[in-house]
A protein has these predicted regions:
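Amphipathic alpha-helical interaction segments
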Residues: 31-38, 63, 155-158
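Charged, amphipathic alpha-helical coiled-coil/dimerization segments
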Residues: 96-158
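Exposed, interaction-prone assembly regions rather than primary DNA-binding/catalytic cores
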Residues: 152-170
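N-terminal helix-turn-helix DNA-binding core of bacterial DNA-binding proteins
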Residues: 27, 37, 41-89
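A structural signal for well-ordered alpha-helices, especially hydrophobic packing surfaces
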Residues: 40, 130, 164-167
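N-terminal leader segment of winged-helix/HTH proteins
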Residues: 1-55
Length: 170
């Protein structure tokens, strides 16, 4: 199914089959959402994960480092803030922080105002790593979107934001 000039993608084939088997069923929603799901899986698996692997990271670890980096100096957040910003489970977050700490990309430090708390801080090595990885990551995303004109990209972004707001609000 990697042929770029194929006339039908998997979602179109499934929708055509449903129209044949269940003509009473509106298959358009399955077709559109199916394309979104397949596209997301392909982007992560075939385009983004190879970037993460190149830098010795997993997807969730990249997210943690990127979240710390975009938080600005001193590039440190509580584990709870990281959990909320990345939508990773608290147990999953602990495992990621442990791996990143072991690799030297982050360190746990005492919270400056809460004696009971800790912060997860980006190390100099982690900052350098995420800066390098981000450059390749953004270029990869730019390449993906290059299939669309600038106006199409803006329209896609607006429509996806609208759908996301709707689904999050339900």
């Amino acid at each position: 199914m990697s042929n770029a000039d194929r006339s039908e993608d998997r979602a179109a084939i499934a929708a055509r089959q449903w129209r044949s088997e269940r003509p009473d069923l509106d298959s358009f929603p399955m077709e559109a959402v199916g394309r979104l799901l397949e596209l997301a899986q392909l982007i992560v698996r075939d385009r983004l994960n190879p970037v993460f692997v190149r830098f010795g990271l997993q997807n969730g670890e990249f997210d943690v480092l990127a979240t710390l980096r975009r938080s600005g100096p001193p590039y440190a957040l509580t584990p709870t803030a990281l959990y909320e910003a990345t939508m990773i489970s608290s147990g999953g977050m602990t495992a990621r922080i442990d791996r990143l700490e072991k690799a030297g990309h982050v360190r746990r430090v005492k919270h400056p105002t809460d004696r009971r708390g800790t912060l997860v801080a980006l190390s100099d090595e982690g900052k350098s790593l995420i800066d390098d990885a981000l450059s390749i990551h953004v270029q990869t995303e730019r390449t993906i979107l290059a299939a669309l004109s600038d106006d199409e990209q803006k329209t896609l972004d607006r429509l996806l934001a609208k759908l996301l707001a709707r689904v999050e609000g339900e």
